[in-house]
Amino acid sequence: MAYRGGGRGGRGGEQRPPYSGRGDVPGRGGGGGGGGAPPYRPASGFVWPPPGMTPRPGPPQPQYPRPGPPAVVYGAPMPAAHHQGAYQPGGVYRAPSPGVPVIGGYARSTPVTIRAPPPSHSSAPAPYQPAAAAPAPSSSSTAPSATALAKEFEQKLFVSETALAPPAAVASAAAAPAGEASVESDKDLAPVSKKGLAHPARPGFGAAGKKVMIRANHFLVNVADNNLFHYDVSINPESKSRATNREVLNELIKLHGKTSLGGKLPAYDGRKSLYTAGSLPFESEEFVVKLIDPEKKDKERAEREYKITIRIAGRTDLYHLQQFLLGRQRDMPQETIQVLDVVLRESPSWNYVTVSRSFFSTQFGHRGDIGEGLECWRGYYQSLRPTQMGLSLNIDISATSFFKPVTVIQFVEEFLNIRDTSRPLSDRDRVKIKKALRGVRIETNHQEDQIRRYKITGITPIPMSQLIFPVDDNGTRKTVVQYFWDRYNYRLKYASWPCLQSGSDSRPVYLPMEVCKIVEGQRYSKKLNDKQVTNILRATCQRPQQREQSIHEMVLHNKYTEDRFAQEFGIKVCNDLVSVPARVLPPPMLKYHDSGREKTCAPSVGQWNMINKKMINGGTVDNWTCLSFSRMRPEEVQRFCGDLIQMCNATGMSFNPRPVVDVRSTNPNNIENALRDVHRRTSELLAREGKGGLQLLIVILPEVSGSYGKIKRVCETDLGIVSQCCLPRHASRPNKQYLENVALKINVKVGGRNTVLERAFIRNGIPFVSEVPTIIFGADVTHPPPGEDSASSIAAVVASMDWPEITKYRGLVSAQPHRQEIIEDLFSVGKDPVKVVNGGMIRELLIAFRKKTGRRPERIIFYRDGVSEGQFSHVLLHEMDAIRKACASLEEGYLPPVTFVVVQKRHHTRLFPEVHGRRDMTDKSGNILPGTVVDRQICHPTEFDFYLCSHAGIQGTSRPTHYHVLYDENHFTADALQSLTNNLCYTYARCTRAVSVVPPAYYAHLAAFRARYYVEGESSDGGSTPGSSGQAVAREGPVEVRQLPKIKENVKDVMFYC
């Protein structure tokens, strides 16, 4: 019985790979589920697929039970899309009955007849006016007007848990004057339930493009028919260490496995859950085991007793998993999949270092030195996933940073780049070391017959030659140096350095660095600097053929067929990568200005150039100047500016060759003063001549990093200057490609367009977008690096400001609580004594779209980046609610249809050509061709998702982007959404290459990273906030969110984040 269920992208116009954080410094190079299944349980087992049944060719078709006597509901909110179970007037459907538990993924239902309210004869609502302010309604329970209900029904609002409630209880307040509606509180448009926001079923498979076969790093998994039992495990005394818990359970299995456990071999998750194939011979039992700690000298302290309680928690079989994989059940049986995943992770958890879903070991290859006391370990990622073809094991090659197992003295020398160890450490050095080593385990080596291990909690503020502590109960006090000489006859050499501290502040243990060595196998979880990132990428970069071979060898090395836990649970893993049908979508035709020799362009293998082309809308720069903080000579700076201006004019811009004030060089130690001075001088001069303000400031950065963030913060939030930063190593020897990339960036920063899709100028040329005014959003949240427990997360939302071109994007940013993924400021409600004040980023961007285009958006497409699968429902629930409220606050009944798509780049699916080396199947780097899309076999069994590799690789293995539609009121077909997403990837402003992530999501990521500079500046020691002590602060309660400085309006009007 069986279940069958990268490399970096293009670099155009930027110094780092996509999503690197710095977005301004250009670089070289090119640019309703099915009806309920009967509650049947097989007596002996089942076969997957069932006898005589072929794998499912398409998405499941809903099967509705026979309706009983209908209930009549007027204007009840219903699902938004036909494939989500949209309801039509006059039809009899079944709605969830309140308070009835879900059985097999579906709740019992009550027949409901939906009747539309009588149509309104009033005139259409007036277009919303941004300046209008609606007075607060006198009561939030005011019955909605017929017009509002008709509009709500027409737009097909969400299904909520109040589907059978009276209309007045579920409709939004509509007591605002025409022109702008008010949303007074959460009672008006309450968040819908997670059950109501069911993800849309796949509308079918795509057919566009050239059909090809490729391979994916997914491996089929067969599972025998077993009853799986879940037991709750309680260990006393409790330990937070998974390793300790595993040792305790392992000792229990050794002592009682063949007796009290009935010969079962359980799988343990290291926390609270134990799983078995078949039941244990008891429902609840207590055991006592003793563990000996070899690091403890005292025998009584070395032996520790643990009491283990095991209780039955539940039972599951594979029936619901079978139904889910067949498409007959929409709710994924997460617990069943988790059991099987834990089983397959049990053996490697014992043998390797576990980091999240990856396993690392020195067995997997050479440890590469990445600098500053760190090294790179190789390993593999493993995750069990339900797919259209059945269960598959996704396996990929991984690498991460570990502490080198060296003495602490050696680590400090490398980490701080110290050459003279006789000098004391500065306060800054001490803080950096304290931050890096906090929580690290070390072992002492000053006693030959005994090795003791400790965990570092801090570093002493004074040198150990001055550090005095009591050594006995008589009050005798000694320095650490004196104590080591008297007690161990050990002369300490680094007396001017501080000590490491273990234990608590009340009972500290002082450890001289020179007697301590870092224990092997500890991951470095802090933020890596640019050099370390480059080193780790260089050490792990593999071309597709090499990576595929490495993955295959890893599967063979793991020997899943011989794994005793897999055998216990009847799991078998295929050793070969699966073959997957795919399609290569054609690239779009791009439109350039008619004054160029080439008016249109057909990209070739995901790239093109600006030869014989002019920007479709070249920007104008009349007022500019340049400020150099580098060591470049003045004549070199002037030559670079001249070359850059010449390139801008040649590619279609109108760029005045004369600066407002002379180009000057200045001291990099006075950056802020220099920026204010040039702003004052240019403003005074331009004011006298009546020529407006400074449009562009070209900045040559210093050779030493650390000033970029300050420059951007001052220019964009204080002075209102659009700036273009350039690295001196590029500006001193610019090539044509570099100048072209900078020109592309400057053009969009001053309001121009570089290119647009040719079909944007054809009536209905872009399906779904050209038909009605459409706004495309991109949203992302960036979180502070590990260890910064008090720093805010930053959300960014961008939205297209032109229709039908869809190329200009306005960006907004907002700070929010630490590591909160849901975007708070999509919609907000504030009150004053007179009126309700609505705000938020979505609302502001909708108003800006209206100002720019003269039309209100009639369709919304929302690309949301950075959401993991476990957060799908939570994010959708709150953010769709915010989008709805933002729209409703602008105009009565204004609820345009929304398509909500999650963009995932942080996954481990890799796609490989069927035949490596064939030029008709690969790009120059050996990767699959740009435009390759996959929506079969390795994708979700029922939901609307696909993988798209839209870019051509440069080095390493390309990572496709995963797009998952969480809500779709626009009823996209698979071809329409896949083609739109792929085509948009050719409109990225900063280079003449198709990028790997749809541009709205890419721009939101850049804007969020730009905003982090506003609160952090740019730190060279790993992104800590200025003034931080480097100490991770335990947060006992909510930390006040530090608000971002406001971006000046003239800066927000352009794509400043590019």
UniProtKB/Swiss-Prot annotation:
Q: Which portions of the chain have biased composition (kind: Gly residues)?
A: 1-12, 24-37
UniProt entry tagged with the keyword Plastid: no
**Residue intervals passing through the bilayer:** none
Keyword line:
Meiosis, Nucleus, RNA-mediated gene silencing
InterPro entries assigned = ArgoL1, ArgoL2, Argonaute_Mid_dom, Argonaute_N, PAZ_dom, PAZ_dom_sf, Piwi, Piwi_ago-like
Domain PAZ spans what residues? 407-520
Q: Which CDD domains match?
A: PAZ_argonaute_like, Piwi_ago-like
One of the record's GO cellular component terms: nucleus
Q: Where is this region: Disordered?
A: 1-77, 115-147
Q: What subcellular compartments does it reside in?
A: Nucleus, Nucleolus
Q: Where is the composition biased (Pro residues)?
A: 48-70
Which BP terms from GO are recorded?
female meiotic nuclear division; male meiotic nuclear division; megagametogenesis; microgametogenesis; positive regulation of meiotic DNA double-strand break formation; regulation of gene expression; regulatory ncRNA-mediated gene silencing
- Supply the Pfam families for this chain: ArgoL1, ArgoL2, ArgoMid, ArgoN, PAZ, Piwi
Please note every region of biased composition (Low complexity): 121-147
- What is the annotated role of this protein in its UniProt record? Essential for the progression of premeiotic mitosis and meiosis during sporogenesis. Regulates the cell division of premeiotic germ cells, the proper modification of meiotic chromosomes, and the faithful progression of meiosis, probably via small RNA-mediated gene silencing. May be involved in histone H3 'Lys-9' demethylation in the pericentromeric region.
Q: Which family does it belong to?
A: Belongs to the argonaute family. Ago subfamily.
Identify this protein by name. Answer: Protein argonaute MEL1
Source organism (scientific name): Oryza sativa subsp. japonica
